[in-house]
């Protein structure tokens, strides 16, 4: 921990909400760097991702949890367990909802979890750029009747509207405390984890509905080539069926090449170095229901 001036505030804040309400977009906007994987498919975020925001007078450590849902397999069980445990560990919860969607059973389910956790909650209504002001006021009233929120802050995570106000509200609810991380550090995840997430994001984005969330990415090797000032990265994309392997590779390898090109650009921005990225695709049947494979592919409750 780092010495800081008197009155410095710090704390751990969980970002929670249904799939695809913009949790990862919000975290990435605040941090100013792509840390949490973004996709329009549910359950994109699998591990708790710590993003660190530091200002002159505060440090906020964000935990981005998987979208809360009813589990369908062991991977789903793992993701839900991570989400529920997080609620009890943090100082403050940001409950993110989609302002363009009506209150429904999914929101009821989450609010019940919030009541059990007994942690202070700020309601963040996202995507306000898509909502009429009258509808927004009505939605705020609906949520206020369901739970006692510390604050309600409407934002557009994609455009950055009202995000500075949200950061001020978060800081207001934190206690005085130490600076846990250096000012220039934005995550505590190892490089391998972030690189794997960037590759997985490109697969999900480029294959759209053809590939469900039955993929994992394993970083086989990261090697810095000093004389060439480049970083060599070898990674395996794991799928459950041969048909999925064919889709990811694509005709004459075109899809895999495109995944590699797009992922490489993000990885180079992350590392600040030229990157040589080599990708392979492997079939591992039904890996999401096998605890050993979940551990092999990085899903460890005690780590994240």
UniProtKB/Swiss-Prot annotation:
GO terms for biological process: ribosomal small subunit assembly. Signal peptide: none annotated. PROSITE patterns: G_ERA (PS51713), KH_TYPE_2 (PS50823). One of its GO terms (molecular function) is ribosomal small subunit binding. Residues 155-157 are annotated as: G5. Keywords: Cell membrane, Cytoplasm, GTP-binding, Membrane, Nucleotide-binding, Ribosome biogenesis, RNA-binding, rRNA-binding. GO terms for cellular component: cytosol; plasma membrane. Belongs to the TRAFAC class TrmE-Era-EngA-EngB-Septin-like GTPase superfamily. Era GTPase family. NCBIfam families: era, PRK00089.1, small_GTP. This is GTPase Era.
